[in-house]
């Protein structure tokens, strides 16, 4: 998944070679609200489920595993019941202008858990 699109890709192995086939592509932009930019986590989940259903239908239900590849600078916090505590902010949100997000995240996590 990237900042503007995501896709579900099937990896096929014939015993000697791995080939990749795109099964589903979807738009993946942010959602603006109150001068902030968020990820639409529920839409992303729905798109991924659609792609996995298409993959299962295309390959006779033979989906053996699932992996996710993403830029990975954003995060959502989960509560004790594994519920999402709030809408994840998009890394292109104005609060990140000129900042080194990875360093900020590490600093915040240290302060929360130490």
Residue ranges of model-derived segments:
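Glycine-rich phosphate-binding/catalytic subdomain of phosphoryl-transfer
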Residues: 53-114
């Amino acid at each position: 998944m990237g900042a503007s699109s995501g896709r579900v890709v099937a990896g096929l192995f014939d015993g000697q070679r791995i080939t990749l086939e795109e099964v589903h592509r979807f738009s993946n932009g942010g959602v603006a609200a109150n001068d902030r930019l968020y990820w639409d986590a529920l839409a992303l989940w729905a798109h991924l489920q659609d792609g996995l259903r298409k993959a299962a239908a295309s390959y006779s239900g033979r989906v053996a595993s699932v992996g996710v590849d993403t830029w990975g600078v954003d995060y959502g916090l989960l509560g004790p019941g594994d519920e999402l505590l709030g809408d994840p902010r998009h890394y292109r949100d104005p609060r990140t202008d000129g900042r080194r997000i990875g360093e900020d995240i590490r600093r915040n996590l240290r302060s929360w858990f130490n």
